[in-house]
Amino acid sequence: YYIKRGDFDTAWDTFEQGMKTVLTVRDFTQIFDAYAETSENVISLMMEELEDEGDEANDNTDTKDRAQQEAEIDRRMQDFEALMERRPFLVNDVLLRRNQDDVQEWEKRVTLWGDNDEMVIATYKNALETINPRKATANLHQFYIHFAQFYEDGGSLGRTDPSAVERDVAAARQIFER
């Protein structure tokens, strides 16, 4: 509806809201694919319009309008790239919404963050606050062990600063004692 009216910002907001509320991967995939396809179409349409204006260019062409159009295309392309980069996290969000006590999905979330130590730690803490031990899937104990090992190893990058390693070992001991 919003796309046909040309109200793309409202359409994007609707897509985002849909992705944040669905409970099945199938529904998410349909919304995500429609969102991505629409974004691609809008970008290609804007690029074609810019090319057409460039072909018809004469001395009266307003360079400010062209610069604004190019900036809008760049912004939309950045948004599209960010959407593609967020996809694994969004799928993981759907699976965690479905079962917040799924230890394996929390482990996948930790893996998605890779070398971003702050987000890895935040994810571990969020998971441990969220997971109900009585409802947790198998290997909750492994999750605690992996968290402690993360600190023991000095994070994902393996710090070499001795004082930082000592603090991390102390944090690892606290986690093991839980």
Each language-model region and where it sits:
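Polyampholytic low-complexity alpha-helical segments
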Residues: Y1-R178
